[in-house]
Amino acid sequence: MWNLRITPLSFGAACQGIFTSTLLLSALTVPLVCTIVYDSCLYMDINASRALANVYDLPDDFFPKIDDLVRDAKDALEPYWKSDSIKKHVLIATHFVDLIEDFWQTTQGMHEIAESLRAVIPPTTAPVPTGYLIQHEEAEEIPLGDLFKHQEERIVSFQPDYPITARIHAHLKAYAKINEESLDRARRLLWWHYNCLLWGEANVTNYISRLRTWLSTPEKYRGRDAPTIEAITRPIQAAQGGRKTSSGTRKPRGLEPRRRKVKTTVVYGRRRSKSRERRAPSPQRAGSPLPRSSSSHHRSPSPRK
């Protein structure tokens, strides 16, 4: 596919097979990463989408090394793998774990082969300048079948009779660098997705926003320590853990009418409700006894006497 002929060398056949496979894998890294990123952004909240875009602006040393990152991601994903979860973050994080493991090993192999070729490169050969090597942004726009041809033309324009071993070394260096930049993007995205599983998407979004604000603030106006996601989620966990559950059963409202509490007062030695309106005295009917006066304290004489 790549039309690479290095049969005069004793190790030409082996290098040709490894070189062809590594070029094919490294060229496929970019579209795989871009496709999955765009697909995931379509189903993402606007704030989370912005936070995910801001992940690319964070310093490189903020993220763990690839070996540590993959190990932490697998620990976070293991419970979801056992339950065959199909959550968005689980599927995307699983994709990036497989992608990073495969292409990271491939990239390390490319570096090892490039270093081993140094011994057979003529000592007087000048290295290909960086400007003649295809960059990551250019590789995204060049068709897959033309990537090798474009790089070969640049090497020839630098030096037409450039030694073939030095050419292979230049190709490996160029494609390994493209792979590393693609892996860096995949590493940041993997960190985002498996942390969303650990802490929740809303908490990770809030954390990224606070962290970028802290980083963009001048040193003399900001706190000494950067915000941590543990400190952000601790108040939420404390509030949830501090809730007390009542042991008794509570009657649901609406099943029985609520009884109205009526205040009462004592009027002339008997209880009388305030809610009841005082009735006006009814007119005296014929034949009814006269009402007893409250001012008279003596008894009326008995008619028997």
Curated annotation (Swiss-Prot):
Designated name of the protein: External core antigen
Propeptide boundaries: 273-305
Annotated organism of origin: Duck hepatitis B virus (isolate Shanghai/DHBVQCA34)
Function: May regulate immune response to the intracellular capsid in acting as a T-cell tolerogen, by having an immunoregulatory effect which prevents destruction of infected cells by cytotoxic T-cells.
Biased composition (Basic residues): 258-277, 295-305
Localisation per UniProt entry: Secreted
Signal sequence region: 1-19
GO CC annotations, alphabetized: extracellular region
